[in-house]
């Protein structure tokens, strides 16, 4: 066994043991730990930023692009937001132990389901140190233990944040091994983590499509994941066009780099001539490159011809594919063929069209008269999220505290026997 395998095996064993203690942890103890972490993050701002400066300097020397450098940097504001996020998670209801789906059988036996932690969650992520705190906090609050493997470019930052997390656990009388930060940059650690079925119950990857595709191929542990967010807005024949304009513009331009950004606009032929010239001009003036089908280009003078690659692409940038369709069926067929199952929306004042779209479009979130950029756990009232899942099993859509738990059946009786 290699040194990395030995190290990861030890981490897995410690975390599995800690997970059993976390299942018994009270809500008060978990909240105490979270609040202690929030105080420590603010109190140790200078130490955190000193560790982060090492990561930023190395990343800059290695030519990391500006957008990723920005994500990597722990500014005063980002540190304050991490502390506030911890307080917000502490204030959320504890899902563990809640009882649902109760019934009484004819023999008097009481049947219910209880929400319980998943166990040990492995989180694999890239350059954002704040994920260390977000992931640790959500796993802690939901009664799980977690193994965190951040990007090599953020190693010093993640290790420093991990020490704060473990100090918070210790202050609340919880096992420090309940949150462990992998302190090696060896990629073999990731390969071992995703195959440790005896110690890890689920993996949550947060990163680019390349990372997630690789993990999906290598993992033996189940993944909560989405590969990409190729999101659509369909403007129906019965749409309010002022509403459609604002929704489509917001869905594309709110933030280009989020997985809920609209990447393809589908417009019914009956309204294309009235909507596309105005909307296209607004998007063009905002710096969005438009790529359209032949029919759409009639009303998009600045547009370029689209091909199949455009329908399949999550741009994560100021590019939008536009297609004119003749029916809602054609729109839904397009989404079924090219979509990623993330988030799709219809703009319409026709109730039956809205209901049909929500029923038949097979995505984790389906909206009526809303922009796709609402795909976020905070906007859903979840308080926070570990990520967004397009899986059909277990969690689907934004994954908050409840998505980090599972259900077990609990039955109570008075001595009944089965005849």
UniProtKB/Swiss-Prot annotation:
Lineage top rank: taxon: Bacteria
Cellular compartments annotated: Cytoplasm
BP-aspect Gene Ontology terms: L-proline biosynthetic process
Reactions performed catalytically: L-glutamate 5-semialdehyde + phosphate + NADP(+) = L-glutamyl 5-phosphate + NADPH + H(+)
EC number(s) from the headed UniProt entry: 1.2.1.41
GO CC terms: cytoplasm
Family as reported in the entry's similarity comment: Belongs to the gamma-glutamyl phosphate reductase family.
Its biological purpose: Catalyzes the NADPH-dependent reduction of L-glutamate 5-phosphate into L-glutamate 5-semialdehyde and phosphate. The product spontaneously undergoes cyclization to form 1-pyrroline-5-carboxylate.
UniProt protein name: Gamma-glutamyl phosphate reductase
